[in-house]
């Protein structure tokens, strides 16, 4: 346990603005790995007494297992948003989270902010919408109508690979995937050059905002 704590401490000391902005893909994956280690340690501490006590029947076991799984899913989704938010702040990007758009939709990230989105004199070409989902599957469609002013939606995901048919459908619907750079190799070769690594996405946003 002490060795694990020292390892986590050493990683934390190496974090600075330069390393985050120059290698956001690498930093994000390192944060996710470290957070998962901490969360597993927390889970063991929290659940061990219950597991040692046991369960009276199958239904109790299933119910308790579902609680654990739901907590894991909730943590993973929220932590991804928080990690991305931290990276965007270090990279000096202007953005706002949970902006209320049409029909009370709330995209995860709007660049540069909600006021610009709702100002119809602000050029739509300078607006960017980014959704963040740990996995895509069929959930990617949720972002399609979250920001009507922005025709091309960006979607960040940690999913390692999506079927060729689903990728084709995504790009027909003007969804541009953003994934950690090391994960691009898991996608069909014919789509790899269309997928943005995180460092390219932050550079893309920065270039637009430098023109404002």
Where are the language model's segments positioned?
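Short, composition-biased local secondary-structure segments
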Residues: 44-60, 108-113, 133-144
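Acidic-basic catalytic patches of nuclease active cores, encompassing PD-(D/E)XK
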Residues: 57-105
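Domain-level recognition of nuclease-like catalytic cores that cleave nucleotide substrates
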Residues: 160-212
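Conserved catalytic cores of phosphodiester-cleaving nucleases, focusing on short active-site segments
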Residues: 88, 109-136, 143-145, 155
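Hydrophobic beta-strand segments of well-ordered beta-sheets in folded domains
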Residues: 128, 151-157, 174-177
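Short, small-residue-biased leader/transition segments that mark boundaries at the very start
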Residues: 3-8
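A short acidic, amphipathic alpha-helical/loop segment
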Residues: 141-146, 166-170
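Hydrophobic alpha-helical interaction segments
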Residues: 12-51
